[in-house]
């Protein structure tokens, strides 16, 4: 699989508004679009996470980027360096008909990751 790192950037804080605060990182390598179960390293600690790679089609964006939702994590890490290791692709990137449909899928993605990490 893939591994990448970068400084957490402020974007539009949409993930937080949807109940899934994400660490946004600019990508500097070619990684296939999709949603992945991942491990994220922050300040020498490793956390289970779900990572989105691609273009946020539901919101009509054109920017290719990475967003990582770190499970059960609520610290402010804007401007901090993190590394993300993709473990398993769980689905393709897709455009949802509504934001609520996307949120329901995100809940399922997080549930799958929790099961994978057994917590």
Locations of regions flagged by a protein language model:
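Phosphate/ribose-recognition catalytic cores of enzymes acting on nucleotide-derived substrates
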Residues: 2-119
């Amino acid at each position: 699989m893939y591994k990448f790192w970068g400084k957490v950037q402020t974007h539009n804080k949409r993930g937080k508004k949807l109940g899934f605060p994400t660490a946004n990182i600019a990508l500097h390598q070619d990684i296939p679009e999709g949603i992945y179960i991942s491990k994220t390293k922050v300040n020498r600690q490793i956390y289970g996470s779900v990572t989105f790679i691609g273009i946020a089609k539901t919101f009509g964006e054109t920017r290719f980027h990475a967003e990582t939702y770190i499970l059960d994590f609520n610290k402010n890490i804007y401007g901090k360096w993190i590394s993300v290791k993709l473990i398993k692709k769980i689905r393709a990137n897709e455009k949802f008909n509504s934001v609520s449909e996307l949120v329901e899928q995100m809940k399922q993605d997080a549930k799958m990751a929790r099961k994978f990490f057994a917590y």
